[in-house]
Amino acid sequence: HKIQQIVNSYKEPPYTSTRYNEIPLQDNMKISGFFQSYKYFNFCRDEILNLFQVCDPMEQKIINNYGMYLDSNVASIHVRRADYLKFSGHYENLGISYYKKAIDLFPETQIIFVFSDDIKWCKKHLPSFGKLNIYVEGQTDVEDLWLMTKMKNNIIANSTFSWWGAYLNKNQNRVVAPTKWFGPKRTADNSLETKDLYPDNWETI
């Protein structure tokens, strides 16, 4: 087969943009960007959900560790700190207040699975909220992501990692997300907009 030369290209606006911009598709086209809106691919969400699978040994490992909770009223909470603290101002520092407001939306019987790159900080601050917290440790990123998709509800950070954990969740779940995504050093005129970032049924605080 003859390899066709790419003759057209499209580059998305800077990655601080969360607006959906319709791509002017043409033949032999290269597209590049972050495309941080579900509207680019929501039409094939069912296909994406079916594609996201883990191998049997990995699934069995996770079920052995946490399966006893998954039929209960469980929610994930993702706390991202390490690199966001390093690049303070570029990303919104959600702080403890965001997580408290989010957790308070759920009943006292809610079991919280905590995912974080700073579990030590979470163990120090989150227990004061009165929920039963299960701190997820010793897993790979793929295992964490897959486990997030098995929750009944998701509380996400301003992070595409937990965004995908919620989006790939097949449950009829409740998703709580932060209103602010980028920090003040991101100067794009639409950097604080999230209308195209989150599906309509997600709650923002």
Where are the regions that the model predicts?
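Non-catalytic N-terminal targeting/anchoring module and adjacent flexible stem/linker
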Residues: 1, 177, 202-205
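Secretory-pathway luminal glycosyltransferase catalytic domains
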Residues: 1-109
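Leloir-type glycosyltransferase catalytic cores
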Residues: 9, 26, 184-205
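A generic alpha-helix propensity feature with a strong bias for hydrophobic helices
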Residues: 16-17, 27, 110, 130, ...
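Donor-binding and catalytic core of enzymes assembling or modifying cell-surface/extracellular glycoconjugates
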Residues: 103-186, 191
